[in-house]
Amino acid sequence: IYPADIESFTVLKNASETALYGSRGASGVIQVKTKKGTGKGFQISYEGNYGIEAMYKSMEMLNAAEYIAAAQKYGLEYNNKGYDTNFRKAITRTGNIQNHYLAFSGGTPQSNYRASFGYIDHNTIIRSKGYRNLVAKIDVTQKAFGDKLTGDFGVFGSSFKNNDIFDSQMLFYSADAMNPTYPYDKLNGSWVKNGAASQVNPPGAVLKERDDTKNMNFNAHLKLNYDMTNSLSVSAFGAYSYA
């Protein structure tokens, strides 16, 4: 559910309140009420924002010349591949996030509708890491027989794609521990991750080890309510979900 679609939410704790949900409501239920058409004529709204994110603070690492000088000063063995690579900068970037939300509604108190569309695109400070989320929702309300019968029909769909790497901790640890005289990539291709290494690996190889996921959800529901008297009503509810 897109946050802007939420009108209110209620926490149900009593047995009488959660009985409708059977065993799934044994530990309580969070009931979310989403916005619907108001029947006040055509209305349209848009919300959007864009933000940039960057690392607040980063450790100062030795460059190639400083690395070699330190190794020589303390009599340490070292390899010099002739490069000057800042591996922390090689795996990070300036991130950005954008949100867009469009909703429109219309109709009369007896027959109204509301549709909304939300989009989130987030590129994190880690290269090749981010997510996209697309949400669409449509609700229609129709009254008949002197407003005694009320029908509510709704459709909801979402698509979520998460571009993630397998081990963020190893990525940063490896970038900070890597010899800066090594290149980020080999001249004839990429570095290969060493499966026997528990902590340090070529950062480029760690960055390419993916843990991507993609989810799609669809839900349609129909509720009919008939007021037989002022104190007695009959309801029927049906829903279909796919994930």
What kind of feature is each model-predicted range?
Residues 16-17, 84:
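Residues that cap or anchor secondary-structure elements
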Residues 93-111, 118-121, 203-242:
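Outer-membrane beta-barrel transmembrane strands
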Residues 12, 33-35, 103-107, 116, ...:
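Transmembrane beta-barrel domains of outer membrane proteins
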Residues 19, 25-48, 100-103:
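N-terminal periplasmic accessory domains that precede
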Residues 12-15, 24-28, 96, 130-135, ...:
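Short, glycine/acidic-rich beta->alpha junctions
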Residues 1-13:
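Short acidic/polar hinge/loop motifs at secondary-structure boundaries
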Residues 2-4, 21-26, 93, 129-132, ...:
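Short, glycine-/polar-rich solvent-exposed loops and beta-turns at beta-strand/coil boundaries
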Residues 38-84, 125-127, 135-219, 235-243:
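Surface-exposed loop/interface segments of Gram-negative outer-membrane beta-barrel transport/assembly proteins
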